[in-house]
């Protein structure tokens, strides 16, 4: 049994998370007294239909409860540190169709919660806790039902709780890391299955079907995001969504896909040759991107400035594209002009957790510097944070052509050499890294060495 499987036999550490959030609020609001109040995602019907929308639990709620049930509420008493989960009571009409729901006793056994009551008791419990307390109810704006009353509380604060949870979510505990390892393990199985099938499949949607089937077969019914299965030049589209084009006549597939395990995401990208052998141009670009990733990973550790790691990746991209002749001129001048953004237009990576693009990254999408505008994490990395490292080089005519028309950039690009690379489409390699005090740990076991990929794909 894997170490992460042993950890996951325990309960999701909801009480520890609640106490961390409470301490954070006290640091922002000295002397804070009262309750934390959260609601899970409520059942919602599809438009013009009596069918419910696919359910996705609110991440703020899950962080303090570990509960994936719909229509639940939660209270944490700041004075006593007691947590109470409210679950839906038995609805006889619903039982006819859906069977018996979880009982309070079962919920208390399953979740790391002190008390479990039913949702028809929420207002009575709030009234009890607020009576004569002179305290504050901390909640999240626009996530409180109109039927919920905070009568008796001296104040209601809808400004602090959301940010407090987001800041606490940045640093993961062992259980959260174990969930991410599990998601990575399942996703790796799916990635490898697609690699094995790519030289016999007919189109992208076959590959997507294989990926989803492998995830589902291993218990991961939910994807962290809509996967990208992009063949040929479509790989130059960063978030390609069609996943339906034929594979015939194309060089490579870029697969960006990750399963979710108990609300925690994996986010993995691999690029591999459809024939089982990289073309000369594809291999050249792949080697540059792999170097970008490996050198970026080498410098990771607690306190590293993510902006600097992103810039390092650009410097390596420039060096590689100069060696190929796609770029020409002086490397420092090309970096200063930001011409490399034409080929590497996105950020090096982002925080990972319950959301694929997880909270706490403080990006600046208004940044006037195009090299940093789409960097989803700005600032230093703390130990315990999870980041993706996903450099890429792309040959997207829509992005590159404006650079070719701008003399500021066109003087650095050799169009005759560039023309040899359009069919490569794009290459991206993405792993999930745990930041430690002295370095990092790669949680993604998916193969990525080019010789190993060629052998793996070619042996199918």
UniProtKB/Swiss-Prot annotation:
Catalyzed reaction equations: Release of any N-terminal amino acid, including proline, that is linked to proline, even from a dipeptide or tripeptide
EC number: 3.4.11.9
Alphabetical UniProt keywords: Aminopeptidase, Hydrolase, Manganese, Metal-binding, Metalloprotease, Protease
CDD domains in the cross-refs: Prolidase
Required co-factors: Mn(2+)
Single GO biological process annotation from the record: proteolysis
InterPro entries attached to this UniProt entry: Aminopep_P_N, Creatin/AminoP/Spt16_N, Creatinase/aminopeptidase-like, Pept_M24, X-Pro_dipept-like
Cofactor comment text: Binds 2 manganese ions per subunit.
KW Protease (keyword) present: yes
Protein residues bound to Mn(2+) 1: 267, 390, 430
One of the record's GO molecular function terms: manganese ion binding
A Pfam cross-reference name: Peptidase_M24
Residues that hold Mn(2+) 2 according to the record: 256, 267, 430
Function description: Catalyzes the removal of a penultimate prolyl residue from the N-termini of peptides.
PANTHER family, A to Z: XAA-PRO AMINOPEPTIDASE 3, XAA-PRO DIPEPTIDASE
UniProt record similarity statement: Belongs to the peptidase M24B family.
Protein name (Swiss-Prot/TrEMBL): Probable Xaa-Pro aminopeptidase VDBG_02538
Source organism of this protein record: Verticillium alfalfae (strain VaMs.102 / ATCC MYA-4576 / FGSC 10136)
Classification of source organism: Eukaryota, Fungi, Dikarya, Ascomycota, Pezizomycotina
């Amino acid at each position: 049994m894997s170490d992460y499987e042993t950890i996951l036999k325990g309960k999701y550490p909801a009480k520890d998370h609640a106490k961390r959030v409470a301490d954070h609020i006290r640091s922002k609001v000295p002397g804070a007294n009262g309750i934390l109040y959260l609601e899970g995602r409520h059942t919602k019907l599809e438009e013009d239909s009596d069918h419910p929308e696919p359910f996705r639990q609110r991440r703020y709620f899950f962080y303090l409860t570990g509960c994936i049930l719909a229509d639940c509420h939660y209270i944490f008493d700041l004075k006593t540190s007691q947590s109470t989960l409210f679950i839906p009571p038995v609805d006889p009409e619903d039982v006819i169709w859906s069977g018996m729901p979880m009982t309070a006793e079962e919920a208390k056994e399953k979740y790391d919660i002190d008390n479990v009551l039913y949702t028809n008791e929420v207002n009575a419990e709030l009234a009890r806790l607020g009576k004569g307390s002179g305290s504050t109810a901390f909640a999240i704006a626009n996530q409180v039902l109109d039927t919920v009353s905070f009568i008796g509380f001296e104040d209601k604060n809808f400004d602090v709780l959301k940010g407090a949870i987001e800041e606490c979510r940045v640093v993961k505990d062992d259980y959260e890391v174990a969930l991410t390892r599990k998601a990575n393990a399942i996703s790796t199985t799916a990635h490898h299955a697609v690699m094995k099938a790519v030289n016999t499949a007919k189109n992208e949607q076959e590959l997507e079907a294989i990926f989803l089937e492998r995830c589902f077969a291993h218990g991961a019914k939910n994807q962290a995001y809509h996967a990208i299965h992009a063949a040929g030049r479509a790989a130059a589209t960063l978030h390609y969504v069609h996943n339906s084009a034929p594979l015939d006549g194309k060089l490579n597939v870029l697969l960006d896909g990750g399963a979710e395990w108990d609300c925690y995401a994996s986010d993995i990208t691999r690029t591999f040759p459809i024939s089982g052998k990289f073309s000369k141009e594809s291999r050249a670009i792949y080697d540059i991107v792999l170097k970008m990733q490996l050198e970026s990973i080498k410098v990771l550790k607690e306190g590293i400035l993510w902006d600097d790691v992103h810039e390092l990746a650009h410097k390596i991209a420039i060096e590689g594209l100069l060696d190929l002749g796609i770029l020409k001129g002086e490397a420092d001048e090309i970096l200063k002009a930001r011409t490399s953004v034409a080929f590497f237009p996105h950020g090096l990576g982002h925080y990972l957790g319950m959301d694929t693009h997880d909270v706490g990254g403080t990006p600046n999408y208004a940044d006037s510097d195009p090299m940093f505008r789409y960097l989803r994490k700005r600032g230093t990395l703390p130990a315990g944070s999870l980041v993706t490292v996903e450099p890429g080089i792309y040959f997207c005519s829509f992005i590159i052509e404006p650079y070719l028309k701008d003399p500021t950039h066109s003087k650095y690009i050799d169009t005759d050499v560039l023309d040899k690379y359009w069919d490569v489409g794009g290459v991206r390699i993405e792993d999930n890294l745990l930041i430690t005090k002295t370095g990092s740990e790669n949680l993604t076991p998916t193969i990525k060495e080019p010789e190993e990929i060629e052998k793996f794909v070619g042996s199918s």
